[in-house]
Amino acid sequence: MGVPVFILAGLLVHFVFLASIFDIYFSSPLVHGMTPQQTPLPPPAKRLVLFVADGLRADSLFELNSNNTPQAPYLRAILENNGSWGISHTRVPTESRPGHVALIAGFYEDVSAVAKGWKENPVEFDSVFNESKHTWSWGSPDILPMFAKGATGDHVYTFCYTAESEDFGAQDAAELDTWVFDHVKSFFNSSRSNQTLFSALNEEKVVLFLHLLGIDTNGHAHRPYSKEYKENIRKVDEGVEEIVSMLESFYGNDGKTAYILTSDHGMTDWGSHGAGHPSETLTPLIAWGAGVNYPQEVTSQLFEDNFLKEWKLENLKRMDVNQADIAPLMASLIGVPFPLNSVGTLPLEYLNNSDHFKAESMFTNAVQVLEQFKVKMSQKKRTTLSFLFTPFKPLSDSEQINFLKKARLYIQQQKYSEAVSLCKTLINLALKGLSYYHTYDRLFLGLSIAVSFVGWTTYVILVIIKTHTNLIKAAQINNKESTGPLYSFMFAGMIIAFFLLIQASPWTYYVYCLLPVPIWYAVVRELHVIQDLAANLWSLPVGHSVGFLLICILGIELLVFSFFYRSTLTVGLLVFAGWPVITQMWVQAKRTTLIWTLLCVFLAVFPLMPVVGREPNIPLVIVAGLTTLLISCFSLASFSRSENKYRGKEDLKVYFYQMFSIALSTYVVSSTHNSLKNKQGLPVFNQIVSWMTLASSSALPLLSPTLLFQRLFSILLSLMATYLLLSTGYEALFPLVLSGLMLVWIQMEQEALQHYGLSLRSKLAVFNFAYATDITQFRQLHLDDIRRSFFFVFFIVTAFFGTGNIASVNSFDPASVYCFLTVFSPFMMGGLLLLKVSNCTFVKFSQRTV
């Protein structure tokens, strides 16, 4: 296999590996074809008002101020005197689209749904809004249209402000909520002169949805503990009070209006969300009005947290729910069918109604969830051979009938508590069954991918050994290749394809299941290399082999632990710092070794630092910029004294422009921070400079000298200019230390190669990227290359996790992108944060030359 073909095959294989993750673990559990289920008894409310305070944390609403006064006096009075309250537990990802879908449709979208966008991709399943007679909604253009466009018919109406209004640098983001409250008031005032609208508003099964984005915007811009965030909560509290008063007056205090206030997600202390920290997943829930229970006083409550004591609510019953449970609660209050795809369980404790109504509602809930289970089971049964199909035994067809008959009998006999208990059991079993059938093929597909992964890794190792060692004797002897393995693998592929065909499997299953066939055929073709390698390994001392194997396992475990505990990287870097001591390099290159040790120790500090802080530390960014300029001056002076001088003034112009970009980026960061702090918005000049710097960062290094160290120096300057613009604190120093360590690593590897009688010092000094160089001509593979490869992978992981957790982009401060934009744009902001994380890795890759 030639090099181009090998590279293309590698890209294709890894693309399949990447796609398989989403297909196996993040596929949507959505099913269609269910029958709507509705409680047969009259509902307690004619209309429902849903307030969603976007980004509102539970503790921010319920906790008292320093002077023991409530943060939201009106809502506090409601939960103490008129309604029920608790915590709504959200799921990952804690983003606006999945959160609102769970609230309004009772359905948890898969994790990949966060990439579907907002208004561009309407929800593709049923919701409370869709089942209502009329729904009027006010708020963000990112949320409302997706429910309106996803609804059947034209009964969901939206009123949105402009997308440009969602500006994190605005003077007062609370104006977004004021806009909503004002437009709701004017809407109801206008209905008095519009008989058609007035009649529609007075019908049954009406929903009013107020999406309040100001709290989320202020949280991103100023943090949840800021004055702006808390003041926004107070304004929302006042606005809710005004809306409730206005509605009660409009409807003549008929007692037929139910109110629910909650949030789609919370927010971290540094103003981001998306992951599973309690500050993001714990959101408030307050319900009051028609059909809702009054506060229940209790003497003790069984909760492991200390929230009740902190919030001084120990005597009022706290009723926690899952976020998806709110959808069936809303449906029950106004008597609409439960959303078809809802997986929520009706929280009966919130209902103030007869036991008969509660039992009937819970029975309806159970049938609605069971309908999904039956559809999911039939789908899986159709695509699985009968003798291979394994049903979900706790909920067989006979068990389903028994559950439903028994529950209905209990209701007829007025044994409502027994009926409710049985329905809850049925719901839990149906949900487990849904999960069972949704993950039915996960093991099968996972094994196929694992076999492919092991096969590809084995093949790559064999190619490296074959290319860079002398294990080619067998290949020279056995010139004739047997056709037996080819026919065997072709037959295996045909069997797999036929098996998938008769099961009507999706086309992706063919890719995942057939991929191991050509990969392992390629491995079998290199059987002679495996035999020669095994013979050589058996000749090695057993003690050395076992010791080397244990070190490899320890190194791999260290890398795995670093994904969960960043401090593990510190341990590895400190071990790296002591590496020269156990080799000859401490004797033959003391100066280089000392610098290596110091830089390893400095770099080891970063994983111990918090991923982000509550407040930006702009002085550290300025220090990083000035340090970069100082190092640049010394480097230019060093290059000018070297034998390989510049081709002309053009080379110097590139470096001077890059240094100017560093200085300008440092100024822009400081200027932008001060401007936003004074609520003056993002200066246009700063925004233009930031985007121009980003655009030029990838092009300027191509204009620099092509000699190794001079090109690497240019790459560092370009990446640092962009990284400074994306920094808010100590992380600005990270790429400087990392790149310095990488440059010293090159020197260290030169010294290490001298142990084998090889020296690249002179060759690296004149190494030129302008000329094609075959690196394989330098030397054969040595055991030390495994250590070198481990260093390479470890430094890549360090580049990703050194200043944050790349597994969760929300561990990075959203203020990092404010030099580029402050108007809400999730994909642009997320892309810039990913660029920030990747920049350090680009530095790492660009300096991996040995």
Where are the regions that the model predicts?
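A short beta-strand-to-alpha-helix junction
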Residues: 91, 117-122, 227-234, 253, ...
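A long, amphipathic alpha-helix that forms part
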Residues: 6, 36, 40-43, 174-201, ...
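Membrane/wall-proximal cationic-aromatic binding patches
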Residues: 24-46
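Phosphate/adenylate-binding glycine loop and adjacent helical scaffold
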Residues: 111, 346-405, 411-439, 451
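Active-site-proximal alpha/beta segments of enzymes that process anionic O-linked groups
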Residues: 5-20, 27, 44-50, 57-206, ...
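Short acidic, glycine/proline-rich loop/turn micro-motifs
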Residues: 64, 220-225, 297-298
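Histidine-centered active-site microenvironments of extracellular/periplasmic hydrolases
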Residues: 253-256, 261-304, 311, 315
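Alpha-helical transmembrane segments of integral membrane proteins
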Residues: 4-25, 440-850
